[in-house]
Amino acid sequence: MNSLDIISIDALYNSGSFTSLDPKAPLLYGSIGFDAKQSYIIKGVIPENSFVSIYGPSGSFKSFLALDWACHIASGMNWDGHKVKKGSVLYVAGEGGIGVSQRVRAWEIHHSGKELSNLARLSAPVFPADGDQVKNILTYCEEIESTTGYPVKLIILDTLARCYGGNDENSSRDMGAFIQGCDQIKLLTGASVLIVHHTGKNIANGARGSSALPAALDVEFQ
């Protein structure tokens, strides 16, 4: 069941607090749940309802890979031999421009003209640390599902820097607010959230910014 069926956007608007929306987690005893299996959007690559990041230096094809995943999910086509669960995708192109639409069209042509009607794009950043922006994302997801008939399975924020506002990437407090916003998006939509992120000046040191981010991720790709 889609999380939007459980927690309405009206409830979100009226609550005044995101944390109060978290449903009470059930108590589990002993080894209950030991045999639960992880479900995937892309088998063995992107788990369902997960927080994922791709990071690397400029020009390392991070966005190219993220968009390729998006296209395969929107089409339901297997990706590199991995089974794919078809669904809608929201791609937030925070850097704007027409590059994303051109890449999508190239993908369609390469795959025999297959139209990606389940792939929705925003050509402007959104800021998960801002509660009002989270509401906007939820509204977009409802609209996308209504239009396509498929729930949003993946939300891509490209890039973290563009969707971070004026906050300090090195601040654990600011990064914590960003992470909390992404968690709320996951909770209320049931989608996975994928962040496209940069390395710092020293590539060997990994992704740029606070270590709170990698600690919060379910999967990280370099």
Can you say where each PLM-predicted feature lies in the sequence?
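N-terminal pre-Walker A segment at the start of P-loop NTPase domains
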Residues: 12-41
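Conserved inter-motif catalytic segment of the P-loop NTP-binding fold
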Residues: 36-37, 41-42, 58-60, 78, ...
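Phosphate-binding/switch region of NTP-binding enzymes
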Residues: 53-54, 59, 63-64, 90, ...
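Active-site catalytic microenvironments for nucleophilic, acid-base chemistry
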Residues: 72-76
